[in-house]
């Protein structure tokens, strides 16, 4: 909870080498969801708004989320589960400067933490790992079976909001601009 009494999200985010999806499916207690996330036009209150469709072909959940940064790795997060009709209505407010992000999220319990690995449809090389924490001082336990490239918690180019502008990680943009396109 933030000082204002609003719900607070505290997390660390890492750029990782894209793991093998089949390997992730074999991890006990792992869960896979498909996610489509669309950013909406800004309002005056400074909150980033988005809608999300999450689930599998058998069951979908729709959410409307508002986030605002308040400190290192900390954001106010207001999230509501909404009916599909409201989701479709809010999609009409999509920010045309951003593309919808499609990803597979693999949630894995690991050493009393929940790992959230996002595998994006636009990248065959990279993925992200997010770990929500009770407070910013809580130590993070990173699994040895993931190739961690960098802590990108406060790096703008790695937020889902930024990724939705280019549908590429900063490293991929640099490779393309540099003519390497590896």
Predicted regions and their residues:
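Phosphate-end processing signature that detects enzymes handling 5′-triphosphorylated RNA
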Residues: 1-182
């Amino acid at each position: 909870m933030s000082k204002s009494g609003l719900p607070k999200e505290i997390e660390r985010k890492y750029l990782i080498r894209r793991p093998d999806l089949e390997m992730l499916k074999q991890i006990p207690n792992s869960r896979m969801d498909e996610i489509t996330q669309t950013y909406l036009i800004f309002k005056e209150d400074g909150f980033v708004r988005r809608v999300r469709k999450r689930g599998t072909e058998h069951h979908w959940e729709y959410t409307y989320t508002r986030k605002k940064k308040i400190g290192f790795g900390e954001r106010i997060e207001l999230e509501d589960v909404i009916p599909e009709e409201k989701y479709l209505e809010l999609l009409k407010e999509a920010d045309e400067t951003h593309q919808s992000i499609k990803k597979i999220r693999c949630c894995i319990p690991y050493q009393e933490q929940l790992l959230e690995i996002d595998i994006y449809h636009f990248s065959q090389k990279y993925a992200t790992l997010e770990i929500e924490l009770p407070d910013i001082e809580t130590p993070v336990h990173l699994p040895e079976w993931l190739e961690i490239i960098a802590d990108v918690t406060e790096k703008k180019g790695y937020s889902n909001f930024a990724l939705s502008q280019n549908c590429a990680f900063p490293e991929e943009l640099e490779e393309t601009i540099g003519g390497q396109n590896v």
